Swiss-Prot record:
Entry membrane topology: Single-pass membrane protein
Transmembrane regions listed in the UniProt entry: 8-24
Protein localization: Membrane
GO cellular component: membrane
Protein name: Uncharacterized protein RP568
Tree of life domain: Bacteria
Keywords, in A-Z order: Membrane, Transmembrane, Transmembrane helix
C-alpha cells in the first residue's frame, strides 16, 4: 500500500510541475510579445521625433522666415522715436559704480563675481606700477 501512495505522490508532483512549467512558459511568451510591441512603439516614436526635428529645421530656416516676413508682415525699420524704456525693468544704473580713472590696458584683470540669483557681474582691477 505504501508503494502505491508513493506512486500517487510522484504522479501528483509531476502533474503540478508540468502545470507550473506550462504557466511559466505561457507567461514568458506573453511578456516577450508585450516587449516586442513596446520596442516597436519606441522605434515608431523615434522615427516620428526625427521627422519632427527635420520639419522644425525646415520651418526655422532663416531664409524662409525672411521671405515670409517680407511677404506677410510688411515690417519697417524701427525709428528712434518709437523706442521707450521698459517701465518694468529694474533701474540698475543706480547700483553701478564706475571708476573713470581706470585705464583699459593689458595689466587690468577682468573678473566675474556672482551676485544674487546666480547672476554675474564683470569687475576690473588694475595694478599700479
Amino acid at each position: 500500500m505504501t508503494i502505491r501512495k508513493f506512486h500517487y505522490l510522484i504522479l501528483f508532483i509531476t502533474i503540478i510541475a508540468i502545470c507550473s512549467l506550462f504557466r511559466i512558459k505561457d507567461r514568458v511568451s506573453t511578456l516577450n510579445y508585450q516587449l516586442r510591441s513596446v520596442i516597436k512603439q519606441i522605434n515608431s516614436e523615434n522615427n516620428n521625433i526625427n521627422i519632427l526635428k527635420a520639419e522644425q529645421a525646415y520651418l526655422l530656416l532663416p531664409t524662409r522666415l525672411e521671405k515670409l516676413a517680407a511677404a506677410y508682415l510688411k515690417l519697417e525699420i524701427v525709428k528712434s522715436y518709437q523706442m521707450i524704456n521698459d517701465p518694468l525693468a529694474p533701474n540698475i544704473e543706480q547700483n553701478i559704480k564706475f571708476n573713470h580713472n581706470i585705464s583699459i590696458s593689458k595689466s587690468n584683470k577682468w573678473r566675474y563675481k556672482r551676485i544674487m540669483n546666480n547672476k554675474y557681474i564683470q569687475t576690473v582691477s588694475s595694478r599700479v606700477k
